[in-house]
Regions:
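Short periplasmic/luminal acceptor-recognition loop of GT-C membrane glycosyltransferases, typified by
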Residues: 3-78, 107-117
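Binuclear metal-ion centers of metallo-dependent hydrolases, dominated by the metallo-beta-lactamase
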Residues: 136-147
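Functionally engaged cysteine thiol sites
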Residues: 67, 130, 146
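Periplasmic/luminal catalytic loop of GT-C fold multi-pass membrane glycosyltransferases
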Residues: 55, 59-63, 79-138
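Compositionally biased amphipathic helical and low-complexity segments enriched in hydrophobic
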Residues: 38, 99, 146-148
Length: 148
């Protein structure tokens, strides 16, 4: 990553004034990523129901007016941030996740398309019959159909 190609993070939100933005996944086009994040902020804030977002952009919760109900502080599928099937804590995590979804009346789980984030972070824990996958320009969205 060439840090001289970074651009002011205040283009994402004024609270990020003084910081510079560049990401290894958008190292040649940080403005493209910022455009995606700004469009995402609008989409997320206009959602009129409770959502959960699985993303590496954990700061989004602090720059939107929407509670994004992150289930974890990080997201990996190697068992480090959430137990994988076969792990002795898998059922405990599954119960934690389902309880959080029910308690917060989550209606959908969002994944940024460009992150190529494994959707197993939700599909491994919720019965496939309870999920309906849809998408828009920026997100894969799993509507939760039967957890009330």
């Amino acid at each position: 990553v060439n840090l001289s190609e970074s651009i002011p993070a205040s283009n994402i939100d004024k609270s990020l004034t003084g910081l510079m933005w560049i990401n290894p996944f958008f190292k040649k086009s940080p403005l493209e990523e910022i455009t995606i994040l700004n469009e995402a902020k609008v989409i997320l804030e206009q959602t009129n129901y409770e959502i959960m977002v699985h993303t590496h952009y954990l700061f989004l919760d602090s720059i939107t007016k929407k509670n994004l109900n992150y289930p974890n502080r990080s997201f990996t599928l190697d068992g480090a941030s959430m137990p994988i099937e076969g792990n002795k804590y898998f059922i405990h995590y599954r119960n934690f996740l389902l309880k959080k979804i029910k308690k917060n009346d989550i209606k959908a789980v969002y994944f940024f398309k460009h992150e190529n984030f494994s959707q197993k972070s939700i599909t491994n824990y919720i019965d496939h019959n309870c999920l309906e996958k849809v998408e828009n320009k920026l997100f894969y969205i799993y509507k939760i159909l039967c957890l009330k």
